[in-house]
């Protein structure tokens, strides 16, 4: 989000912790973490507890765990149960099981019930499932939906499917719960109920895993409308493979403008340093073939030839003729004739 400037920032009294905190919080709320950090650090030096709380969130967000520990420890050790819980999370992220466990237990003993889930989750991640259940169950029975879902996973892994189902149904406002219910009913071959829960997870809670399952389901069932719907939801979250699949669909429909747009989103997204894409799932030759056709339609002939050159899809006569027709429609008759001739020898 664009930085929002506030008046008189240069005239702030450094000893005014509350004012510094409010300035930092305003920047934080408006998406400027760098400026938020600057003022929250000054407020934290004056012992402002809420400044430390937000500052720790910023450092956790950017994985600056040593800084988060530095600001949290003094106040956490003074008995603040929320900061004890957050410090437990810092140590969990640092894979320091003993200190994470210590601070979560400290927070629980000081009355912070949310730490029951966090400690249960810690035990779960370190494969201490019996201990995880000991802390998750009281939290789940107090309507902590994250605890209900994680407890259900443990019961499911232990073969206690009925117990898993019971706790998933208790988590009424949790997309992961609906996704897991869909998975559970799918394994029971109750496809109608599975689909119902998966669609709730995908459409209402924007659950990515449910969207992935559903687009594949509808692709297998030749339901193009719903396949496109769930691919579009995934694309909205920058799921790179979905751009390629949508591009392929639109290319097959001769909607080359939309196909080109989706392929371009894929190529641009793939360049990002944090891009996650499994190229094993993508038919690169088909991608280049379809993108080449889009380029012809949009008059980008050099790009077209770059993608079509030595493409394995041009070993099929009908595909060669399709490309030739596109060049003919684009009034590139010389190239069209070359493709028509080559189709005779495929």
Regions found by a protein language model. Name each.
Residues 8-13, 269-282:
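Flexible helix-coil transition and linker loops at the boundaries of alpha-helical arrays
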